[in-house]
Amino acid sequence: MSRPRCSRCQRPSSLCLCALIPALDSRTQVLVLQHSSEASHALNTARLAALGLCNAELRVGERFEDDCDAARLSYLLFPGEDAIPLGSLADAAQPVRLIVPDGTWRKARKILHVNPWLAELPRVALPEGLSSRYRLRKAPMPGVLSTIEAIVTALNLLESPSRFDELLRPFDALIEGQIDAMGREVYQRNHADT
């Protein structure tokens, strides 16, 4: 029998993170396109980001409809040779819409592949050399962040340094809860060098 879950954060009721999730407003609209395989993942950071941002939406699936609004410039937050530095949009006269694919790198690339309209959007990238707080996963390459970390970094660059850091509180608690559940000794043995 499965444990009762919080209907909002989807965590087991005894590990509910809702008290830590802020309600932050942003000028930037965030649309997270989450691969369906991530939706039930225990460490689902995209859901935390969407819950903590008043101007965010989370869509789950693999194929998504193009509903880009001409009144709001849309950008794809995803690295690539043609990606422009995200910070260059900080002084944009009109609000922007940031579209963020969520999943493993392989699944995120698949989202881009099966949704050709995403490839038509201008890409923006985070600065190089960032380090992740995600101590439970080994990054496939240096400078890789979880979805929530990428969104917080992006919003801090676009709007105001450190204004969105509060969104990382439930993420930090999520990581600590997982470490406590596995035991500190197991964590040290398997993840201490990540």
Model-inferred region functions:
Residues 1-3:
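Immediate flanking context of iron-sulfur cluster ligation sites
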Residues 35, 79, 128:
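Cofactor-binding loop segments of dinucleotide-utilizing enzymes, especially the Rossmann-like FAD-
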Residues 13-16:
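Cys/His-rich microdomains that often coordinate metals
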